[in-house]
């Protein structure tokens, strides 16, 4: 179906082993090509929601569909194949610090190989060319042979974005991608995500602390408080009072 959501969460609840409720009856549809930002207090459930989408956190109840197929019920090889469609960008960059930028970015292709091959990082010339082109796209080609630990935080995050581009997913989940960066670098990182969204029609879902960045880059905003969605609307139709309510109307709880 042409109007089938890229991501759909149906009555999703997440309860941790200690009894903490991370998500409470979440119902959400995100269409292909949207740039969605999720806002809320620290501990409101933003990261839990994002990580549930690709099953970094398994949910307790409900179902999550990726392009109409349940990721919740998928196992083994089929789960690995489904995760190819989903790229993840973390606050902590998740790079191999002692490896070169090229090798880190080439790792975006690992999902396309059997486990034995990924163990030895056996990348083809085509993989390396894809990686170089991805680095060009984010303005980092001159660092191709540098070690990851020689880069600034902003440069490392842009390398992480290039790695996702090399994967060629349909969905990008960005978990606080600018949290540890200065304002100028944060904007550069968001511009890179915007480029992936517009040039490659990738669906982007990003958790953001910065309301300014959320307003500038998001097509749609979702407000989360205490594990529940308390607002969902177009950014252009969202007044400041909505953000005030999301941040001042309730208290977050601790996440993993």
Curated annotation (Swiss-Prot):
Which EC number(s) does the record attach to this protein?
Answer: 7.3.2.2
Query: Which reactions are catalysed by this chain?
Result: phosphonate(out) + ATP + H2O = phosphonate(in) + ADP + phosphate + H(+)
Protein name (record): Phosphonates import ATP-binding protein PhnC
Q: Which residues form the signal peptide?
A: none
- UniProt subunit comment: The complex is composed of two ATP-binding proteins (PhnC), two transmembrane proteins (PhnE) and a solute-binding protein (PhnD).
InterPro entries named in the record: AAA+_ATPase (IPR003593), ABC_transporter-like_ATP-bd (IPR003439), ABC_transporter-like_CS (IPR017871), ABC_transpr_PhnC (IPR012693), MetN_ABC_transporter-like (IPR050086), P-loop_NTPase (IPR027417)
Q: Where is the ABC transporter domain?
A: 7-251
What the entry lists under Gene3D superfamilies is as follows: P-loop containing nucleotide triphosphate hydrolases (3.40.50.300)
Compartments where located:
Cell membrane
> Which family does the similarity line name?
Belongs to the ABC transporter superfamily. Phosphonates importer (TC 3.A.1.9.1) family.
**Job description of the protein:** Part of the ABC transporter complex PhnCDE involved in phosphonates import. Responsible for energy coupling to the transport system.
Keyword set includes Repressor: no
The source organism is: Lactobacillus delbrueckii subsp. bulgaricus (strain ATCC 11842 / DSM 20081 / BCRC 10696 / JCM 1002 / NBRC 13953 / NCIMB 11778 / NCTC 12712 / WDCM 00102 / Lb 14)
Q: Which CDD domains match?
A: ABC_PhnC_transporter
């Amino acid at each position: 179906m042409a109007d089938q959501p890229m991501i759909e969460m149906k009555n999703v609840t997440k309860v941790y082993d200690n009894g903490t409720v991370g998500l409470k009856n979440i119902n959400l549809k995100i269409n292909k090509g949207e740039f969605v930002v999720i806002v809320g207090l620290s501990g409101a459930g933003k990261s839990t929601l994002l990580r549930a989408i690709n099953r970094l956190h398994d949910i307790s109840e409900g179902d999550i569909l990726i392009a109409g197929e349940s990721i919740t019920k998928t196992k083994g090889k089929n789960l690995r194949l489904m995760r190819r469609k989903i790229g993840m960008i973390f606050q902590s960059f998740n790079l191999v610090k002692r490896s070169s930028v090229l090798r880190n970015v080439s790792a975006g292709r690992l999902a396309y190989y059997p486990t034995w091959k990924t163990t030895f990082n056996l990348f083809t010339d085509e993989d390396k060319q894809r990686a170089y082109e991805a680095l060009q796209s984010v303005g980092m080609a001159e660092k191709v042979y540098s070690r990851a630990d020689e880069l600034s935080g902003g440069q490392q995050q842009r390398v992480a974005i290039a790695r996702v581009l090399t994967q060629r997913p349909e969905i990008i989940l960005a978990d606080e991608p600018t949290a540890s960066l200065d304002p100028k670098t944060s904007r550069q990182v968001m511009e890179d995500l915007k480029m992936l969204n517009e040039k490659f029609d990738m669906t982007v879902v990003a958790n953001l602390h910065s309301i300014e960045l959320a307003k500038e880059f998001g097509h749609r905003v979702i407000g989360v408080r205490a594990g529940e969605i308390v607002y969902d609307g177009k950014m252009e139709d969202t007044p400041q009072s909505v953000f005030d309510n999301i941040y001042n109307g309730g208290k977050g709880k601790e996440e993993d």
